[in-house]
Amino acid sequence: MESTLRSGGTTVEEVVLNLLSVNYNELVMAASGEAAEKALADTNAKEHILVVNGSIPLKDGGIYCTIGGKSAEQVLRESAENATMILAVGACAVFGSVQAAKPNPTGAVGVDEIIKDKQVINVSGCPPIGEVITASLAYILTHGKAPELDSEGRPLFAYGQRIHDSCPRRPHFDAGQYVRTFDDAGAREGWCLYDVGCKGPSTFSPCPILQWNLKAGWPIGAGHPCIGCTERDFYDRFTPFYQKLPTVPGFGVEATAEKIGLGLTGVVAAGVAVHAGVTAARAAADRKATKNSPMAAFGDAPTDSPSPSSTGQATEQNSEAK
């Protein structure tokens, strides 16, 4: 919601008051208490589009998040029953985000780990970009169906390309010009942040194009490396945040950044064009075809997760990764 409030184009006031019928949202609705719960129940009884924000904790019967005496899992199942479309908005709703990081003490999971019988559109990011949220809703309302999705359920129009492929600092990567420390000359000149931990080569997101706060800025533009927050289990796979990724895809093989950048001497212009085109094409194709496509990372995603019950009451299961 915070990100949506600061989106550009159509204002959130126009969206909420004139374009959409937002029957239940704790942050913008006037009702509270029993009146709010009645609004939710009335909406759940008929067809609707469900937008979910936040992870769902399953351990210990779901006691770590309760609303109106019901666990978050119960509320989700009831709300999803008559939903014609479901959007999981934000990294928490998509895969659990930081709450789901090992050892995941609350058993936090994303929406699509609970709702298996309906399509879930995953609008990932921490936070997600407001324009991607509103564009996804606009597409659904206009076409009556979900936009084309990648293998992880994310809209391809937004998540079809890596940050690395459209980053304004990409020419410095190709030229082998890297920030080595945050106070060096390269940092002042706006060089590539790969050496100080940027996860842009492994992260699919439109951040460089849309940015945040009416295009006022974004992390890399402010001099901070991308942490990969749109990618599943990023906190387990991409930490330490300020450590360089082991490898990045280049010229069809895994090559270090130094080999890609410094090895282009004499053929820079042609090589850069080929590298950018090939990696962009491979990125879109790989993400479209394969869930959890192999990308440079420090570790694997957690292997164990809590199991939601068929009755809406979470089972108690150790969610710590093996």
Tell what function each PLM region has:
Residues I227:
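Cys/His/Pro-rich metal-binding microdomains
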Residues Y235-D236:
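Short, non-ligating residues that shape and space the ligands of small metal-coordination modules
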Residues P208-A216, Y242-V253:
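Short, membrane-exposed interhelical loops at transmembrane-helix boundaries
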Residues E231:
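Short Cys/His-rich local motifs and their 1-3 flanking residues in nucleic-acid-associated proteins
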Residues F251-T265:
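Juxtamembrane/start-of-transmembrane alpha-helix segments at the extracytoplasmic/lumenal side
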Residues A285-K322:
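Cytoplasmic C-terminal tails of single-pass
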Residues V75-R77, D112-K116, P249-A255, G299-P302, ...:
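Mid-to-C-terminal functional-domain signal that highlights helix-capping/loop sites
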Residues M1-P206, G217-P219, T239, G263-R287:
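Iron-sulfur-associated redox domains of electron-transfer enzymes in respiratory
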